[in-house]
Regions:
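Bacterial N-terminal signal peptides that target proteins for export
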Residues: 1-10
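Sec/Tat signal peptide C-region and signal peptidase I cleavage site
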Residues: 19-25
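Exposed beta-sheet edge and beta->alpha loop/turn motif
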Residues: 39, 118-153
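A short, amphipathic edge element
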Residues: 105-117
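Early exported N-terminus immediately downstream of N-terminal targeting peptides
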Residues: 27-105
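Sterically constrained small-residue positions within well-ordered secondary structures
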Residues: 16, 57, 106, 119-121, ...
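Bacterial N-terminal signal peptides
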Residues: 9-18
Length: 153
């Protein structure tokens, strides 16, 4: 049940595809499938738990807009904070996010996530729908990814 709640949180994850990065030219659904494939490889049984956690943290740092999520969680309180407070909050949030994200997923074995569809919401946002395929040990879980495509020129 905890893992299902965690995956529900994934709906709010904003992933940035930046032109400074080779993934800019990749379609959002292909980017998501590539990212989940990398995560699945990181969860291979040949790696120790620490190695899995390190690999998952690296993937998250590359693909998740952790600062954007931290500001989103602050909501309207953000405007009342100084730049130094925002910087400290973002640093602590990143530590918490990476620890929570990686340690929960590191316990998961053989995840198989399939991208099912994508829907362009506007010029910058695309919603990619996927599913964690059910097994004898777990039910099917739907995961929606909100992808923000950022063109830095």
């Amino acid at each position: 049940m905890e893992f299902k709640k965690f995956l529900s949180f994934a709906i709010f994850i904003i992933i940035i595809i930046s032109s400074n990065n080779s993934v800019y030219s990749i379609e959002p659904d292909i980017f998501v499938q590539s990212t989940v494939n990398r995560a699945s490889q990181a969860l291979d049984d040949k790696f120790s738990k620490k190695e899995k956690i390190d690999k998952l943290k690296s993937i998250a740092k590359e693909t998740v807009d952790i600062q954007g999520i931290s500001f989103y969680t602050l909501g309207s309180y953000r405007k009342n904070l100084s730049d130094e407070q925002k910087k400290e909050y973002t640093k602590l949030f990143e530590q918490y996010f990476l620890k929570s994200f990686s340690s929960r997923l590191a316990e998961y074995s053989n995840p198989h996530i399939e991208v099912q569809s994508k829907k362009k919401l506007n010029e910058n946002y695309t919603m990619v729908s996927s599913v964690l395929v059910e097994t004898e040990m777990r039910p099917e879980v739907k995961i929606d990814w909100r992808i923000y495509t950022k063109n830095i020129e």
